[in-house]
Structure formats: C-alpha cells, structure tokens
Amino acid sequence: MFRIVRRAAIAATLMLVTAAASAQDRRQNRPGNFDFYVLSLSWSPSFCEASAEKGRAPREQCGGRPYSFVVHGLWPQYEKGFPEYCQNPAPRLDRTIVSSMLDLMPAPRLVFHEWDRHGVCSGLGPRGYFDVVRKARAQVKIPEPYIELARPLTVTPDEVEEAFVEANPGLTRTGIAVTCDSRRLHEVRICMSKDLRFRDCADIDRRACRRDRLVMPPMRGGTGPN
C-alpha cells in the first residue's frame, strides 16, 4: 500500500513539473519576448589572466592594447532565467557590423557568439541589436578608480557595486551584480529595461559573487576607453 501511495505521489509531482516546464516553454526562446536586458561588462585583465593560465588567451583581446572593462554582451532576460539561441541558424552577421563593434567587444569571435546566443533573442536585426548594445554601454559610466588601473587592486564586491552606483544615478544595489572566479573580479552585470533605463533584478542580484576579497589585475599599460 505504501509503495502505491508513494508512486502516486511521484507521478503527481512529475505531472506538476512537466506542466510548469510546458508553460515556460510556450514563452521560452521566442525572439523579442523577454523582460529586460543585462549588460555584462568583463574586466578584460581578469579574463586574459585566466585565459593565459589555461593556455588559450585570444590575441585580439589579450595582446598589447590596454583594455579595461569591455562588453561581454547584452543579454535578454526573463525575471527568472533567460532565452538563448532563439533562431537556429541565426540570421547572418555581416563582417562590417563585427568590425564596427571591436572597440567595445575586442574579439570577432565574441561578437559572432553573442549574436548567435543572445542577440537573436532580442527580436532585432543585427544592426538594430548592436546599435542597442552601443547605446547600453554609453549609459554606463565606469568609476574613476577603474579607468586606468596600473597596479593590481584588491576590492570587495560591495565596494565595486557601490562605486558603480555612485557613478551612475538611477542605478541601485539590487540592479547590479559582480561576478568572480576563485580570486579575481570577473564581470559587472547591470540590469536595464528594454528602453535602457536602470532597473532592479532580484534573480541576477542573488547570483552575485559572495567572496570577501577579489583582485583586479592591472591593465596592460596606457589609457583604456571610459
């Protein structure tokens, strides 16, 4: 008798999970059907240092140019979760568009990847999407201490978030998240509405780095974009 009841309970649970998944699937991965954007800014020196440790640092981004924060991507998001690869194959991305984005996204492979995985989910064409990427980046002011970083800097996630909040009126601590690896600051992720206004995003904020101290490796020298 116990086994019968247990099997019935398991079956009921599976039905609920399947129903919930089906409800999500009706919306999931439909181009243009999302709630907000996340602008992900990667601290390039951390990326290059970590990539070099694995023996695969891309020359375009990790050569001699002094990159600081670069655009990793502008990602359509749901309030929980995110769409990806909304069209397969993705509409063709012209190389002139790729070239036009290299000041913000320094590796062509990154531009192609971001379009295929995230850009098509915006519901915009290639030119329209990357225009929005550029506008989103222009909305964010990089705090002064991180513009020309000549020496390694030890920070806390809270310090970095607070610096961005102070530099960007309208941005709140629940609308930004710092990510990290085992010891380095990795990215700063900023939530924006579809019309590129700062907004809160509880799901992104919950997944922020929880380490006490992080290192920001220095830039390669010279002056980076701000």
Listing of model-derived features with the role each one plays in the protein:
Residues 38, 52-226:
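Domain-level detector of nuclease and nuclease-like folds
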Residues 1-10:
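Bacterial N-terminal signal peptides that target proteins for export
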